[in-house]
Each structure stands twice: as C-alpha cells, then as structure tokens.
Amino acid sequence: MKVNIIKKRSFHSLLPGLLPLFVLAHFAHHLVTALPVPLLPLIRDDFALDYTQSGLVLSAFTLSYGVSQLLGGWLTDRIGPRILITMGICGVGLGGLLVGLSQTYVMMIAFLVLMGLLGGGYHPASPPLVSTLVESKNRGRALGFHLIGGSASFFLAPLIAAAIALVWGWRGSFITLAVPTIVFGIVFYILLGRLADTKQDQDKIISGHNQTPPTVHRLHHLVPFIILSTFTGAVTLATISFIPLFVVDHFGISREVAAALIAVIYFAGLWASPLGGHLSDRLGRVPVLLTVCFMAGPVIYLLNLVPYGLGFGAILLIIGMVLYIPQPASEAYIVGQVSERHRSSILGIYYFSAIGGTGVLTPVIGYLIDHFGFYLTFTLTGAVLVTVTLVCSIFLWRSRD
C-alpha cells in the first residue's frame, strides 16, 4: 500500500479546483440513471405493463447497480478511485445508450442490468477522495456540495427527458443523454490527472490511500446507523418510483407532466444536501439522521391525504429533504468511523444496502399496489419506517458522533 501525504485544505479553497470537477462528475454519472423513474409511464404504455412488471423495470437497474457497489468498493481500495470513478461514468452512459436502442422488453431489462453493473464504481470511490481534501470539521459540507451534482441530474434529467420524449419517445431520451455522459467520462479522466498539481496529489488520486488506523471501530453504532440510513433511503426511493404512476392514475395527470413532476423531489437535493452536510458538521451525524428518519414515515402517509396542487408539491419537496439531508451525514459518519484503507469497501456495503434494497422493495411495493391499492401501501410503508427508526434510535441515541 502506498503511503502519501496530502495537505488538508479549507472548504472554500477547493471551490476553484477539484471539488467542482467532482460535482460535474456526479452530475454526469446520474444523468442517465435518473431516467427510468420519470420515463416509467411511457415505458409502461409501450410494453403494456402492470405495476409489478413496472417495478421489475426499475429493479433490473437498481439490483445490479446495488450489487456492483460491493465490487466497486473492493476494487477502489486496491487499484484506486480514479479508474473506478471514470468507469462508473462511462459505464452508465454505454448502458443507457443500449437501453435506448432496445426494441423488446427483454432487451431493455438486460441492458438496464448491464447499466447497473457498469456504474457501480462511482459512489464507493468518490466520497473518500473528496473527504481527504478537507479537514474533518468540514467533511459534511464538502460531501454535501459534491452531492449537488447528483441532485442536479435527478432534477434536470426528468425535465429534459420529458421534453425529448415528446419528439423522439423514451428511447430518444436515453440515447440523447447517454452520448454526452460517455464523452464527459473520458474528459474527466484526463482532467483529473492534469488537476493534480503535485506528485503527492497525483498519487492520492491514483491510489486513494493515506495514513489512518487500519480498524473499523465503534461497530455497535456503525451497524444500526447503516441499517437505518440505508433502509429509510431504500423505502423512500422505492416509493418515489411509483409517484409518476400514482399521479397519472390517481389524479389523471398526463404522462409527460408526471415525468416532469418527479423533478420537484430532486430539486430539494440542490439545497438539502449542502444543508444536511452543514448541519451534520455542527450538530452531529446521528441527530441529523434520526430527525429526518422520524419524518419519513408520516410524510409518505400524507401522500394519501393531500390533494393535487401546491400541497402535493410541498409533500414532494419534503420527501426530497428526507432523501437528501441524511446522505452527506451518512457518508461523513462512515468516513469518520472507518480506516481509509477500508472506507470504499464499507461505502460499497452501504450503497449496496441502499440501492440493492431499493431494487428488492420496488417490485414488492408494486405488488402491494396491484393487490391493495395506493392508500394501504403508503400507510403500511409509513408505519414500517417509523417502527424501524424507533428500534435503531435505541442503539444510536447516546452516540456523540
């Protein structure tokens, strides 16, 4: 293992350099992965799918994407983050291009699986690299700023995809956004090497290792923290997956408007992620996570009660806060609890649990909707979230992190 020394920088000193590049990289990585949910009504009608089959469309990507996080984390700890991040960007672009070229349901499912497998290197590799560039007291802010890129993709991609789909259909949306993603991945690899202005920085980008104790400590807090964070995120994402179908079938909204409406949720990430990082630096990672997780269940239940309009838009915005505020807190908590030589591997487990959990739960929620309707499904989902949060809070309440 290489041991390299890199000077920790202030948060603001990073803004003209590496950090904005990582924000753009995060944006590019999710530009295509953000498409299946808003385009689901169009895909459903094209292949005449029911709710369960629609859930399987989303699971094809999320399950493979989740599993690939494990391999991506393991490889990052051994060959370094630069290659894995680049593969994560170009891989989803290639997979998305093939999805856009698919002509049958089976072909689309196969290429969605491929897209997930090729994209698993980005998330386990990027947070440790970003976190090593700042002092620990600013770690949450840096990670929150980095998350703006992903949030921007999930906010803009539905709007762009809906506009493209009006002319070229859902396949045109995948193809149009996949091509620039691949191009950026290649450019990113070159720029990341050029922006390393010292030999130490270059080694840091290539190897990703530094001097830290080689242990995983405070396991009794780390495990329930990861369980709570990933379970809440997985349930929330699985529920979000059916919101476009919910507004089409429940409120009679057009498919194109439903595709664009999902952007309201992800708009929250543009400011909720930095806010979550800032709050976690000031108040602690655990208090931020517990507060937001206690909100998740009631907010999902309120989808049953709020009529379409400004109130419904407010609920979507709060769901976005529930989704995005805990993310920088969770990443910062894991980075702070785990030695650097194992960080990407543990982050791989974290993202596997969250994304893979979404892949498992999405068809389950689709099945419940098919058999019991939206009202009972949202009610049950909210109750389960509250219960899990209560149980995990028992183990986390006294944590000072």
Briefly describe each language-model feature range.
Residues P36-V37, H221-L270:
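Extracytoplasmic gate region of multi-pass secondary transporters
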Residues V67-Q103:
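Conserved MFS/SLC helix-loop-helix module at the cytosolic interface between two early adjacent transmembrane helices
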Residues I43-R44, L75-T76, I160-W168, V247-V248, ...:
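Interfacial helix-cap and linker-helix signal at transmembrane-aqueous boundaries
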Residues F111-G149:
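Cytoplasmic helix-loop-helix junction between adjacent transmembrane helices
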Residues A48, G80, L101-V106, G284, ...:
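Helix-breaking motifs and short loop linkers at transmembrane-helix boundaries and internal kinks
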Residues H146-G193:
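Helix-loop-helix hairpin linking two adjacent transmembrane segments in secondary transporters
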